[in-house]
Amino acid sequence: PILEKTRQEYLMYLLKLCTGLSLLMSAYNDVIFAPHLMAENGLGNIFLLVEVVIGILLILNFHIFAATILLFLLCIGVAFTFGALVALEYLNMTGIACCLLLFNFHPEKYRVHLKAYSISSLRILTGIALVSLGLSEKLLNPDLGEFFVAQYQWNFMLNLGFTDFSNELFVFCAGMMEVNFGIILIIGTTTRVNILVVSAFMFTSNITFFASGNYSEALLEIFGHLPFIATAMILIFFGS
């Protein structure tokens, strides 16, 4: 039991560390969560400051309750500033806040019962984020995805010899896969296998950026994926 508890604590700290690093990198680049969510005017600067504070608290493993509350508020701020759809796309950050809050709940006598809900909230909200990303950036708005694929030569199927695999087909398949993976996460079946496959595709995207020589974009992609990488490790360890 002691070893099991230690492993759980290490995994939770990994989630804090990865999320904190991702937030600090976002703040350094003057964005909120992702490159297309630019921080503008005074409110944007407040968001950046909140990102920095949350990132430092999570990395130092200090005042986690305050950090999770600030992360909740930041997610709400994103929803009001950029719209509900964008908030859904990054609902995994809300899931991380829920997970850390429930896993470190006080008083401690309630913590044992809430730990199970912490993992479920992380899994379900991450699943909703994947479904939202698949729909908004690919299936419902394929032009955006096709522009991205063409600009960064991201269609790795062509590099594998599938010459008839067009950018349009690539974007459609990527969107369908994200939606399906997200639904499976929400349902909670074959969680470990599902999250491993999603992680493999994210790893492929990072390799593709490096292979195409877009090193700065690759670095941003890695830091942006850090919260998901930690989430994947937690779901692999805990399951559904």
Label every PLM stretch briefly.
Residues 182:
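Conformational-control "hinges and anchors"
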Residues 1-147, 162-176, 187-240:
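Extended, low-polarity transmembrane helix blocks
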Residues 153-162:
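Juxtamembrane membrane-water interface segments that cap and precede transmembrane helices
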